[in-house]
Amino acid sequence: MNFINYITAILLSLDPAYSDKENWEERTARMEIIATAIDDASSKTTCSDKYDVPGCEKTWPGDKKSIAMLLITKGFWESKFAKNVHEGNCRPYECDSFTSNGRTIHKARSLWQIQKTGLVSKEEYNQMKSATLSSTTIAANVAVRYLALGMKSCKTIRGAISIYGGARVCNWSGAAPREAFYRRIISMSDEQIASSVNTRKNKLENRLKSEIIVKNEKK
């Protein structure tokens, strides 16, 4: 399978956010958008594929797969790739919210929960509010900047995760389960991925069927 299909399969192998009400076809289509964005960001930071051109500056020291799996890891732990977060419709308690003059304001945007800092331009930040391919690709590329900065500072995957999470040390305790998740998905065989995707598909379809039954019983 090509790399975008590979990323899509990894994404589909993960538990969906409980709030997501997509059917399998809808979820697959959205995961394909995320996978395409991750593919672009991973290629750009490693100067591979269409970015393998004179003048490209490699910002990630590892290969394309390593940064792609790290983007999946961060996206899952930051938002579980929830549909409402992807679309920019965070609930009052999500996306690093606070209240000002009776208004709920969300500081973090996109599946990677990116806040406005010096690593993000105003234009980029303003565009990270939808589930379009363009918006998702911008967010994935910005997320890479944070991860690359952490890797440059700490020289380890755990360090990159730690710095991304706001820690000022390279061995933040909260990074351990995230690193374990990263190690698990990057080492999955094609057979393991396919089996996990099939399991998630069956669980999702059964859940949706159960919800329909309950809804009909309440009528």
Regions inferred by a protein language model and the residue ranges of each:
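Catalytic glycan-binding domains that act on GlcNAc-containing polysaccharides
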Residues: 3, 11-219
